[in-house]
């Protein structure tokens, strides 16, 4: 309704009864009255508009929030690479886990909330469109860490599927602040993980985590987040962990693949028994065989390239890690180069698979934080209770070069002309720099519930045995799955809105 509009039924008749001059005066008076009423309404509603703006964009709630910025410095010089800097890798674990008898109370779970509240009346249509674009396309991987007093969405006691070595609170870690830091991209918000939204987006689909023990770390984080709204059914076996959510027919799976490429132990050339051989140009056949069963795959690898292995390319031995018996022959490929080749191999093979059209997410190198030495030379992350402050990121030459080779291998695969539109289903989840700040998120010496474990440095300053590679749960690793959910949302909703879909 237009403000101060005259009632047509009476006013129109009245005007026609007056002479022309009188009717003109009447119109003038009516227009003046309309202007006064409209101006009064604007003055009256201004405070209300301010209140609405304050409600949606309140600033006092962020006054006490601490921000730790992730600062990208392209001029950083990586330190020399040494295989001794590589972190330890746990032995391949068995997948035949028994279904935990966990209980959950939905009243204690803080899930991401969706609201039907309208936007402030001060936001124009163009501004709304700009905000939607930013929310959909913004860079998730450059931003800052901020302290969130709400804390995590689960506890070590509310998730029965937790590898004990990552159960930091259960293992006696005295501080808990590391659980409260959340990631904030520079251009948008990364929503809290919403388990119900995830299960609805993935309805009838399967998400698989494929990789080493750090991939298991991420998979267990995903399970802990989902377990808060529904207890799944264990449908796994020794070859593959599988958890089924009845309400939405969603399956979460995990496959162990140390290197993501074909491996074998039989003698090859001058490489005898007792050492693992890797065909860098052949994908792990178990992954390829299982691919048609998956709709989304989260890949990760790299840390096993610190272990002893032989590298084979084009059916020729070209290098090795901690192995090269014939010093008279030159090595063509080291473990860093081998890692990059393996990434390109598996990404191309998945993208070209005739029976796999799913979304592939490659999570980049997960940084370790062995400070003062390597994992086997006195490196430590003991006593770290919050993220590194802005600008204080400690460079690690091995981390930087491994991340570079991984990203290069991915982009080479994506650039393959033979992939066509299938390259759009390949996503790089680049977490390395952001998580370089999270030296506080590792178990450190709190790797077991043993009350007699050593957690302090000895008289000679020697640190206790510790894990500065994997992540506490709950902890920073949960952010990875917030990113996974956002990538899935963008892909699925983008397909629904695409005319060609």
Swiss-Prot record:
Q: Name one GO molecular function term.
A: O-acetyltransferase activity
- GO cellular component: a single term: Golgi trans cisterna
Q: What induces it?
A: By dark.
Q: Which UniProt keywords apply?
A: Membrane, Signal-anchor, Transmembrane, Transmembrane helix
> What are the Basic and acidic residues biased-composition ranges?
94-113, 449-459
What ranges does the record list as Low complexity composition bias? 78-89
Question: Where does the chain cross the membrane?
Answer: 25-45
Q: Spell out the InterPro entries in the cross-references.
A: TBL (IPR029962), TBL_C (IPR026057), TBL_N (IPR025846)
What ranges does the record give for the region Disordered, renumbered to this chain? 69-131, 438-467
Short motif GDS motif, span? 211-213
Where can this protein be found?
Membrane
The protein's topology relative to the membrane is: Single-pass type II membrane protein
Q: Which N-terminal residues, if any, form the signal peptide?
A: none
A single GO BP: leaf senescence
Where does motif DCXHWCLPGXXDXWN motif map? Answer: 467-481
Q: What else is known?
A: Contains 2 motifs that are conserved in esterases, but it is unlikely that this protein belongs to the catalytically active pectin esterases.
By sequence similarity, the record places it as follows: Belongs to the PC-esterase family. TBL subfamily.
What this protein is reported to do is described as:
May act as a bridging protein that binds pectin and other cell wall polysaccharides. Probably involved in maintaining esterification of pectins. May be involved in the specific O-acetylation of cell wall polymers.
Query: What's the protein called, per UniProt?
Result: Protein YLS7
């Amino acid at each position: 309704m237009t403000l101060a509009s005259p009632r047509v039924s009476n006013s129109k008749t009245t005007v026609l009864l007056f002479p022309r001059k009188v009717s003109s005066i009447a119109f003038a008076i009516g227009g003046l009255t309309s202007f006064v009423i409209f101006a009064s309404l604007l003055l009256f509603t201004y405070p209300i508009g301010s209140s609405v703006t304050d409600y949606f964009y309140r600033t006092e709630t962020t006054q006490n929030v601490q921000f730790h910025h992730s600062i990208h410095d392209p001029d950083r010089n990586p330190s020399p690479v040494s295989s001794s800097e590589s972190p330890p890798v746990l032995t391949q674990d068995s997948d035949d886990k028994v279904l935990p008898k966990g209980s959950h109370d939905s009243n204690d779970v803080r899930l991401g909330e969706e609201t039907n509240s309208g936007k402030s009346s001060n936001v124009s249509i163009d501004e709304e469109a700009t905000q939607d674009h930013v929310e959909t396309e913004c860079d998730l991987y450059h931003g800052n860490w901020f302290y969130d007093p709400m804390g995590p969405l689960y506890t070590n006691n509310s998730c029965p599927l937790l590898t004990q070595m990552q159960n930091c609170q259960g293992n006696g870690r005295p501080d808990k602040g590391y659980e409260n830091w959340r990631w904030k991209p520079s251009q948008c918000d990364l929503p809290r993980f919403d388990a119900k939204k995830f299960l609805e987006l993935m309805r009838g689909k399967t998400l698989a985590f494929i990789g080493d023990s750090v991939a298991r770390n991420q998979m267990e984080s995903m399970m802990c987040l989902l377990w808060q709204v529904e207890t799944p059914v264990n449908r796994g076996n020794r070859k593959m962990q599988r958890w089924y959510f009845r309400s939405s027919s969603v399956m979460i799976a995990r496959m162990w693949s140390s290197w993501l490429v074909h491996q074998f132990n039989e003698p090859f050339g001058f490489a005898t028994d007792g050492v693992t051989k890797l065909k860098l140009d052949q994908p792990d056949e178990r992954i390829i065989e299982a691919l048609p069963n998956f709709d989304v795959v989260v890949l990760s690898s790299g840390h096993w390239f610190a272990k002893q292995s032989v590298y084979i390319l084009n059916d020729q031995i070209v290098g090795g890690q901690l192995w090269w018996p014939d010093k008279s022959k030159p090595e063509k490929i080291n473990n860093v180069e081998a890692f990059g080749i393996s990434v390109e191999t598996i990404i191309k093979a998945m993208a070209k698979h005739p029976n796999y059209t799913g979304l592939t997410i490659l999570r980049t190198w997960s940084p370790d934080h062995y400070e003062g030495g390597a994992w086997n030379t006195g490196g430590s992350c003991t006593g770290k209770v919050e993220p590194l402050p802005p600008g204080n990121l400690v460079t690690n030459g091995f981390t930087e070069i491994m991340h570079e080779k991984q990203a290069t291998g991915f982009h080479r695969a994506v650039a393959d002309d033979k992939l066509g539109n299938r390259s759009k289903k390949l996503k790089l989840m680049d977490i390395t720099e952001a998580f370089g700040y999270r030296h506080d998120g590792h178990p450190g010496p709190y790797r077991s519930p043993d009350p007699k474990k050593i957690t302090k440095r000895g008289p000679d300053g020697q640190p206790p045995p510790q894990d500065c590679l994997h992540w506490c749960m709950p902890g920073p690793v949960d952010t990875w799955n917030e990113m996974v959910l956002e990538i899935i949302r963008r892909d699925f909703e983008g397909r629904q809105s695409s005319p060609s879909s």
